[in-house]
Amino acid sequence: MSAEQKYFENAQNVHFTLADGSKIPGLGLGTWRSEPNQTKNAVKTALQYGYRHIDAAAIYGNEDEVGDGIKESGVPRKDIWVTSKLWCNAHAPEAVPKALEKTLKDLKLDYLDEYLIHWPVSFKTGEDKFPKDKDGNLIYEKNPIEETWKAMEKLLETGKVRHIGLSNFNDTNLERILKVAKVKPAVHQMELHPFLPQTEFVEKHKKLGIHVTAYSPFGNQNTIYESKIPKLIEHETIQKIAKSKGEGVTGATIAVSWAITRGTSVIPKSVNEQRIKSNFKYIPLTKEDMDEINSIGIRARFNQATFSNEPVFAGLEDGRT
């Protein structure tokens, strides 16, 4: 067996066990900012190649294409872990089940494996994804996240959602949920990469039995993230370790492997067939590798949530680029 085949099989086989015993694939496909008319083929390609986790969200505006890609892949639904997220315009408790129904309709699915509150930010309830007043200012609405969470818990009773969780919550907002939760969040999705490891926060989740999924694992590779610092996957430390592992190992491989080695699942995004396939590799990194990566001194959070009316990342490891 070649080294590349071994890395591929590692990626296929790696799973993490959630608190209820369910197993979430360690490596999935993100669909944020996947271009129109390309998302379907990206999802189809990923699933046919070996991915078994597809990460979607209402705000991405492409759940219909995600659903088409799942259907056309030929991979049985029971073998795929599908995640979606509740957008900020549906935090009112009565809006939560309606938002789920819209997502399921678009995805052409009967249930989700995982449904997350996308952000602890509440906009005016309605169809408009970013509701604004006549002056162009975003319109916010008071919907306590505790009440939104209770509405999420009720979704579990319908069988249309199997796990519920959070995305982009800081410690304060996480604690607010934990105080009222009858069902503890199964998963918390957050920006994580070697420039933003958030080690203490990740460790807290492990102790709580809440699985963590890393998004934007390549950091500032996405063109939406303007940055004055070098590309993460081109950093000399990342490249040095990649070269030491042999042919076919890239900076992206190391970034993905770093995430998985530290116990988090990871959802790199691409619509490029070659990159979708090349991203699907996992090399268990040594302690020396991990220590070297963790010693990188750069700290940068690229998703700054400029639409929020609150400092949603207050108290967390941060970085301004």
UniProtKB/Swiss-Prot annotation:
Q: Which residues does this entry assign to the site Lowers pKa of active site Tyr?
A: 85
Q: Which terms are listed as keywords in the entry?
A: Oxidoreductase
Q: Which GO terms describe its cellular component?
A: cytosol; nucleus
Q: What is this protein called?
A: Uncharacterized oxidoreductase C26F1.07
Q: Where is the active site?
A: 60 (proton donor)
InterPro entries of this UniProt entry? AKR, Aldo/ket_reductase_CS, NADP_OxRdtase_dom, NADP_OxRdtase_dom_sf
Q: What is its EC number?
A: 1.-.-.-
Detail the disulphide connectivity of this chain as listed in its UniProt entry. none
Binding residues for substrate: 118
Q: Which organism is it from?
A: Schizosaccharomyces pombe (strain 972 / ATCC 24843)
Q: Name one GO molecular function term.
A: aldose reductase (NADPH) activity
Its domain of life reads Eukaryota
PROSITE patterns for this protein: ALDOKETO_REDUCTASE_1, ALDOKETO_REDUCTASE_2
Annotated GO biological process = arabinose catabolic process; cellular detoxification; D-xylose catabolic process
Family stated for the protein in its record: Belongs to the aldo/keto reductase family.
SUPFAM superfamilies in UniProt? NAD(P)-linked oxidoreductase
